[in-house]
Amino acid sequence: MSKFSFTIHSNYKKARSGVITTAHGKIRTPTFMPVGTRGTVKAMLTESVVETGADILLGNTYHLMLQPSAERIAYLGGLHKFMNWDKPILTDSGGFQVMSLSKLRKITEEGVSFRSHINGNKYMLTPEYSTEIQYLLGSTITMALDECTPYPSTFEEAKTSMNLTTRWANRSRDAFVKREGYAQFGIIQGSVYKELREQSVKDLVKFDFDGYAIGGLAVGEGQELMFKVLDYVSDFLPQNKPRYLMGVGKPADIIGAVSRGIDMFDCVIPTRSGRNGQAFTKYGTVNIRNSKYAEDKAPLEYDCKCPACTNYTKAYLHHLVRIREILGPMLMTWHNLTYFQNLMSRIRAYIKLGKDFDFVN
């Protein structure tokens, strides 16, 4: 079994390309992780996700702990076997979903108490329990429990939240069972305040996490402010550890973040957009529902190798989506995930060549 490691092969300004080696295989970076919230990437067979070029998936601890339960997944051989995926899986801590329950949850020093949105059952998600759940799932990369600081927050509110995240990170690290090829990432908080972000990095680096995620962004602050935060946070972070920007997936945001030293991304945008009839292409987005595509004989993209582009026209995809045929969202999702993996492949190639990669419309 391979040890967990991160090797940077090429640099271009702040951008890096390399390989993360794990117990479940290698991850080419920069990388985009399709979101498999409940143990499936919506509208996709697992083997189809492989064909898009994805190296790693994201699973959601909150949803999986409720249905079918971490214990049941462990009994059935772990999340990899359960969903027939033999590549790396990163699981979030469940914190973001729990925090978003608002009226159904309460935050204390111990953790977050909440009621299930499914049946009202009460749970307490602590740093230790979140880490245990992810262990039972068999996650390749486990995330420490954090409090996702809302935006906007005052300096004092952000500081209080950041300090709680630091204490939870310490407990998460203590609870993590170290195994060869497996990893745990800490999550940097501090809202939009440079002083707090720097302090958060200093605090979490003491726990020697295997990688570091940047949380609390893409929550309403806008691209300009997000990039401003990334400009200085990347200078604070260790150069030899992977950096993960959580929940960011717009192509222009990915390119801007990679140029600021980010290695990993996840987002529901490609799958959600696909189900809603929106396709990403090198020439901009296509709303396939639009009547102008009703007799369009061209594919979404001529040089895309996905089944939607190699086998079907825009007119056919328009027809499927308009009549709400289930094949429509499946093909649109397959195309979008392929687009995102092609985007990451192009970015990696440009970094290796030492060229600018601002090629998103």
Swiss-Prot record:
Catalytic class of the enzyme: transferase
Record flagged with keyword Nuclease: no
Pathway: tRNA modification; tRNA-queuosine biosynthesis
Cofactor binding note from Swiss-Prot or TrEMBL: Binds 1 zinc ion per subunit.
UniProt-annotated stretches for the region RNA binding: 247-253, 271-275
One Pfam assignment: TGT
Keyword check for Transcription: no
Any one GO biological process: tRNA-guanine transglycosylation
Required cofactor(s): Zn(2+)
Enzyme Commission (EC) number: 2.4.2.29
InterPro entries xref list: ArchSynthase1/Queuine_TRR, TGT, TGT-like_sf, tRNA_ribo_trans-like
Entry GO CC: cytoplasm
Keywords: Glycosyltransferase, Metal-binding, Queuosine biosynthesis, Transferase, tRNA processing, Zinc
Active site: 92, 266
Catalytic reaction(s) noted: 7-aminomethyl-7-carbaguanine + guanosine(34) in tRNA = 7-aminomethyl-7-carbaguanosine(34) in tRNA + guanine
Ligand binding (substrate): 92-96, 146, 189, 216
Binding site for Zn(2+): 304, 306, 309, 335
Family membership noted in the UniProt record: Belongs to the queuine tRNA-ribosyltransferase family.
Subunit structure as annotated in this protein's UniProt entry: Homodimer. Within each dimer, one monomer is responsible for RNA recognition and catalysis, while the other monomer binds to the replacement base PreQ1.
Functional summary from the UniProt entry: Catalyzes the base-exchange of a guanine (G) residue with the queuine precursor 7-aminomethyl-7-deazaguanine (PreQ1) at position 34 (anticodon wobble position) in tRNAs with GU(N) anticodons (tRNA-Asp, -Asn, -His and -Tyr). Catalysis occurs through a double-displacement mechanism. The nucleophile active site attacks the C1' of nucleotide 34 to detach the guanine base from the RNA, forming a covalent enzyme-RNA intermediate. The proton acceptor active site deprotonates the incoming PreQ1, allowing a nucleophilic attack on the C1' of the ribose to form the product.
Name assigned to this protein: Queuine tRNA-ribosyltransferase
